[in-house]
Every structure is written in structure tokens, then in C-alpha cells.
Amino acid sequence: MRTTYMAKPHEVERKWYTIDATNKPLGRLASEIAEILRGKHKPTFTPHVDTGDYVIVLNAEKVLLTGKKRTQKHHYRHSGYPGGLKAINYETLLNTKPEKAIELAVKGMLPKNRLGRKMIKKLKVYAGDEHPHQAQQPEPWEG
């Protein structure tokens, strides 16, 4: 009898990849990152096991938003109190915290459960082209 291979959590080997966000559309970049974080690029992908790799995103400040999204698209958050809805447009968000824009886009594409919260921790985003992860010997992602 043949059965489908299911990865075990202790068998998963993780790699580190770097992605340059310069002039890449935010959504397309985020979907590519989410695929790597989930492990869907591997033949050993198993839905209930975190088989993904680590991703280092560089030059987050140079990410591209097409059309008028830079000024018209908003990110909303709520404090939990009445009247506590806060809105910030992406132009302000990219000027103040460019890392946050990519993190939010990727987080929306990951599962909304314990596994998704574990996956988002493997994402490292930096505004410039410097990162402190040289010891992990990251490879550039060829996607």
C-alpha cells in the first residue's frame, strides 16, 4: 500500500533566503514570501507541519505600490475602545515603518492559527540593505 509522505517537525531542514524588495510590487512580493514561509516550494510540504524556510527581506523602503495605492490605501487598527479606530495611509506607513507594510501584507496571506503565528516569526524585514544574519549564510532567492 502506498501512502502520502508526511513531514515530521523534527525532520524539517530550514534554509535562509534573502529577497531584495527594490521595485517589486508589494502584493506579488508578499505572496512569494508567504509561499516560502509555508514551505509550499518544497516537495516535502505538509499542511499541518511548519516546513517553511527563513526569509530576510532587504530594501523594504523601496517596495512598489502601483496606481494610487500609496496615497489612497489605508491600514486600519482598533484600540478596543469606543471610537478607537486608527487609520494610516501607506505613504505615511512606508515613510515611517517600511518593514511594517511588508509584514502586514505577508501576515494576511498566512494561515490565521497557531501555525501561522509560528511562520511569521521566520520573516525578517529590514528597510536598508544591511542585515545581522550573515552567520546563517543566507542564499539569494531565485524565484
From Swiss-Prot:
Keywords: Ribonucleoprotein, Ribosomal protein
GO cellular component, one term: cytosolic large ribosomal subunit
InterPro entries for this protein: Ribosomal_uL13 (IPR005822), Ribosomal_uL13_bac-type (IPR005823), Ribosomal_uL13_CS (IPR023563), Ribosomal_uL13_sf (IPR036899)
CDD domains listed in its UniProt record: Ribosomal_L13 (cd00392)
Classification via Gene3D superfamilies: Ribosomal protein L13
GO biological process, alphabetically ordered: negative regulation of translation; translation
Disulfide linkage: none
Gene Ontology molecular-function annotations: mRNA binding; structural constituent of ribosome
One matching Pfam family: Ribosomal_L13
Family, as annotated: Belongs to the universal ribosomal protein uL13 family.
Summary of the function given for this chain in its UniProt record: This protein is one of the early assembly proteins of the 50S ribosomal subunit, although it is not seen to bind rRNA by itself. It is important during the early stages of 50S assembly.
Subunit structure: Part of the 50S ribosomal subunit.
This protein's name: Large ribosomal subunit protein uL13
Originating organism: Natranaerobius thermophilus (strain ATCC BAA-1301 / DSM 18059 / JW/NM-WN-LF)
Phylogenetic placement of the source organism: Bacteria, Bacillati, Bacillota, Clostridia, Natranaerobiales
